[in-house]
Swiss-Prot record:
It is found in: Cytoplasm. The active site is at K161 (proton acceptor). Specifically methylates the uridine in position 2552 of 23S rRNA at the 2'-O position of the ribose in the fully assembled 50S ribosomal subunit. Keywords: Cytoplasm, Methyltransferase, rRNA processing, S-adenosyl-L-methionine, Transferase. One of its GO terms (molecular function) is rRNA (uridine-2'-O-)-methyltransferase activity. Its EC number is 2.1.1.166. The keyword Transferase applies. It comes from Cellvibrio japonicus (strain Ueda107) (Pseudomonas fluorescens subsp. cellulosa). Its main location: cytoplasm. It comes from the Bacteria. It catalyses: uridine(2552) in 23S rRNA + S-adenosyl-L-methionine = 2'-O-methyluridine(2552) in 23S rRNA + S-adenosyl-L-homocysteine + H(+). This is Ribosomal RNA large subunit methyltransferase E. S-adenosyl-L-methionine binds at G60, W62, D80, D96, D121.
Length: 211
């Protein structure tokens, strides 16, 4: 089957991308690893010994970074509907974390250890139709925040990918009602044309309505 011009253009861009080349050289699973590395450098999110929950983890670019950063005395609990190859120091739970059975597996994996950080690089399969894609993207990031509300320890932190568009401003208001500090980041590894940004919530307070 012949490829479309757009798919050929994507392939050319992908394989010439400096972060794709760098990920191969550095042994990271995806270019997305560099987004979390930069976020961590700026916001000091991950430290040795932490417990991190990674939502939408496959193929493992963020879990790989988190596992390296928390070290042998920390843990990463990762979940995705898609399968993910094993990573050292990462416990992977396959399934939809909105299902009670999967959520309970995550809680079982967490155990009695307070969760220091919830991270999410989730995004829907993009159709190119904003009226379809944006609500789906906001739904996922709202699910990630719901999970954070349920498992984060007081003063814990949260990172998630969000797309500019309908629902974005309200989401930021909701975040500001849950954390002492909220910042927006656009890592260098994010493609400039992408509407994606990363919200960083620091110092979990529980949640209250912000007008």
């Amino acid at each position: 089957m012949a490829r479309s011009k757009s798919s050929n253009r994507w392939l050319e861009e992908h394989f010439s991308d400096q972060y794709v080349k760098k990920s191969h050289a550095d042994g990271y699973r995806t270019r997305a690893s560099y987004k979390l590395l930069e976020l961590n450098d700026k916001d000091r999110l991950i430290r040795p010994g932490m417990l991190v929950v990674d939502l939408g983890a496959a193929p493992g670019g963020w879990s790989q970074v988190a596992g390296q950063q928390v070290g042998t005395h920390g843990r990463v609990v990762a979940s995705d509907i898609l399968p993910m190859d094993t990573l050292e120091g990462v416990e992977f739970i396959q399934g939809d974390f909105t299902d009670d059975s999967v959520f309970n597996q995550i809680l079982l994996a967490i155990g009695d250890t307070p969760v220091d950080l919830v991270i999410s690089d989730m995004a829907p399969n993009m159709s190119g139709i904003n009226a379809v894609d944006q609500p789906q993207a906001m739904y996922l990031v709202e699910l990630a925040l719901d999970m954070a509300k349920r498992v984060l320890k007081p003063q814990g932190n949260f990172v998630a990918k969000v797309f500019h568009g309908e629902g974005y401003d309200q989401y930021l208001k909701d975040l500001k009602g849950c954390f002492e500090k909220v910042v927006i980041r656009k890592p260098d590894a994010s493609r400039s044309r992408s509407r994606e940004v990363y919200v960083v919530g620091k110092g979990f307070l529980g949640c209250q309505t912000v007008s």
